[in-house]
UniProtKB/Swiss-Prot annotation:
It comes from the Eukaryota. It comes from Caenorhabditis elegans. This is Forkhead box protein F. Transcription factor that is required for cell fate of coelomocytes which are non-muscle mesodermal cells. Acts in concert with, and by activating expression of, the homeodomain gene ceh-34. Binds to the sequence motif 5'-ATAAA[T/C]A-3'. Residues 37-57 have a biased composition (Acidic residues).
Amino acid sequence: MECSTAIYSLANALGPLKLDSTAPNNSHRTIKAENYFNEDEEDYNENSHEDSEDSKEDSDGQGCRSRKRKEKPPFSYIALIAMAISKRPDKKATLAEIYSYLQENFEFFRGEYAGWRNSIRHNLSLNECFVKLPKDTGESYRGRKGHKWTISDSCEFMLEENGFRRRPRGYKARKRTHFPGVTASNEMGIGGATFDYPSSTTELTDSGTSSLNTDVKNILLNGGEDFGPSISDQLVSSTTSAVLPSLNGPDQSPIYPNYFGYGTAEFPMQWASPTYDWPYYATPHIGLCSSDFPGISPSPTVTPQVSPYFYPPAITTASSFMDDWRFGVSSAAVGAYDSSASFLAAETTAGDVAIPQDLSDC
């Protein structure tokens, strides 16, 4: 009972609880925040005012500069110098005369900006289009300072067809190269005469090349029993049947082919044949070593001298012929060369000039 009376007396002392919907009073905090924002606004206004004043000054400065400097002419400094020199009667001008010409004809050079003078001197002294002339000892040169400048003869083409316009950076004058011997794209002059030469191998007719392939195929498919002048005659007739460009000029001696283009009758190349006017087919001067290439026998090397004959290998089957026709002489054909000593002997006794055979021995 004593505990309950103590609790009741404490509740009576506290009194009933009251719920108030009003917000607590935070007036002191609000005052501090208002003062803080007011200070920030004052600083911002001061800074913006200063920025606006600076921008006004900058705009006024730019306006002054834009009013002082005129628009630059649509020409490069090289073109301006060339114009000043070309307007002179003697096509020669000093640096002072170039300055005066530019100031008289262009408003840009009459302003307060003086940096263009350095650009004129720089382009005048470093460009290959302008030549500095030495001083002469005469009355006209007495008391005058500076050298005269003129335009180089190799750069006069720049003055034609809008040559005064600005060119890309790093431009240099191109020197013209003349070739007196060549009169056209497909002509060559030799000794005062002009000869045409084929621009490409496609100018040969298809009929001539097809007839050559057919004749060679028929000869090789016969088994290679008859090797003599008949084969060479057929091959030469087949090659000459193709339409090839003429090597004989009008009223000129026969021209023989050589390694470097056209030969002459007085100085023909050693391997050029006086009988035929077109190169013949020959085996390249290459020797093989059997130790370095196992399975392949050494191939003979044929050095053409005066004989225009072409000796095909003895091939008996059509399949081996097609393989050799596509990929060159095979190992079997090379072996046929080695085993055909009697064939070479027969050719020698027939009255033809023997072709030297050089075998590379290891």
